[in-house]
Amino acid sequence: MIRYSAIVQGRVQGVGFRYFIQLTACKLSLTGWCKNLMNGNVEIEVQGLENNVLSFVSEIKKGNGFAKVSDIDLNILPVLDGEKKFSIKY
């Protein structure tokens, strides 16, 4: 198990990107959350099997066809026990 925080930069708000993030995380059996930041970026915390998290990051970099990701800043975090789902925070 591994957990990352990520700040995603680019055209990532107002284009269905958080929903795309949530769907991608659920398909890969990952937990965590994502939310829009006031500066136009999206913040993500994601946790799961390392290969699945790496696949998630790869998919997020590609975007959903409407979003345009210019950069992702990743940092490793301690794993959270008991987290059961991936949610969108508002």
UniProtKB/Swiss-Prot annotation:
Keywords linked to the UniProt accession: Hydrolase
Keyword Hydrolase annotated: yes
Domain of life: Bacteria
Keyword Hydrolase on entry: yes
GO molecular function, a single term: acylphosphatase activity
Protein family (similarity comment): Belongs to the acylphosphatase family.
PANTHER family recorded: ACYLPHOSPHATASE
Record's protein name: Acylphosphatase
